[in-house]
């Protein structure tokens, strides 16, 4: 009698086991896929991210039960990168005065937003998910706002600012960096005669103009 052959189901199981799979990297791959979709202006969904990641439609749901969970993970990572870049810039200039630190903060903020437009879009609007649903994102955003407020409060305490309501100065500083970043993301600068290669220089000039306007003379 000939030797017993392996059953077909067993052969299929072996094939499935040999097929490349993302294993522990699946979460990372799905986040990258969602970011790519957002950068393209495409509709983001867990199933579409799975298709881009070349995994079965059901595989992502062990990590992300819905679209909000997926986009929250993308936003939380973006915010961590954002904070890390700003903190690194400020760490390099610990002895600088508050107004110089605000300038460094503003430039770091704007450069990151200009170089990471998809990330900035996700963390700065409610287009993709309800920001309040992520405690980590809310905390990080609050800490960034507090950093802006703190730098300008230090300038006021050191007598470096012209007489003005501090809260107004802080809101104006926040509006400047956020508003400039949004103008760039939304494609406004060509209408103002500012070409793509000139935007960063314009950011520096606008920050300097703001600082000269609030600084005591």
Task: Please annotate each region the language model reported.
Residues 76-102, 138-142, 153-157:
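Amphipathic alpha-helical linker/stalk segments
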Residues 73, 87-119, 169-173:
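Hydrophobic alpha-helical connector segments
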Residues 38, 71-78, 123, 140:
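Alpha-helical DNA-contacting segments of helix-turn-helix folds
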Residues 132-138, 142, 156-206, 217:
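Hydrophobic/aromatic-rich alpha-helical bundle segments in the mid-to-C-terminal region
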Residues 29, 37-69, 73:
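Helix-turn-helix
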Residues 1-25, 217:
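N-terminal intrinsically disordered/low-complexity leader segments
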Residues 111, 115-150, 196:
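Short secondary-structure transition hinges
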Residues 25-34, 49, 74-78, 82, ...:
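Generic hydrophobic, amphipathic alpha-helix propensity
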């Amino acid at each position: 009698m000939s030797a017993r052959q392996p059953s077909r189901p067993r052969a299929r199981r072996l094939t499935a086991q040999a097929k490349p799979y993302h294993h522990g990297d699946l979460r990372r791959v799905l986040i990258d896929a969602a970011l790519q979709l957002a950068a393209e202006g495409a509709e983001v969904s867990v199933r579409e991210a799975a298709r881009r990641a070349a995994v079965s439609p059901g595989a992502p749901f062990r990590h992300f039960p819905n679209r909000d969970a997926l986009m929250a993970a993308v936003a939380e990572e973006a915010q961590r990168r954002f904070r890390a870049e700003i903190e690194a810039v400020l760490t390099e200039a610990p002895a600088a005065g508050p107004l110089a630190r605000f300038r460094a903060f503003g430039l770091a903020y704007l450069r990151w937003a200009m170089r990471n437009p998809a990330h900035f879009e996700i963390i700065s609007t409610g287009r993709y998910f309800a920001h309040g649903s992520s405690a980590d994102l809310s905390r990080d955003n609050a800490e960034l706002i507090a950093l802006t407020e703190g730098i300008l409060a230090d300038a006021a305490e050191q007598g470096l600012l012209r007489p003005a309501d501090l809260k107004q100065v802080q809101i104006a500083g926040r509006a400047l960096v956020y508003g400039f970043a949004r103008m760039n993301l939304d494609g406004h600068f060509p209408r103002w005669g500012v070409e793509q290669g000139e935007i960063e220089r314009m950011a520096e000039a606008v920050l300097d103009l703001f600082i000269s306007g609030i600084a005591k003379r």
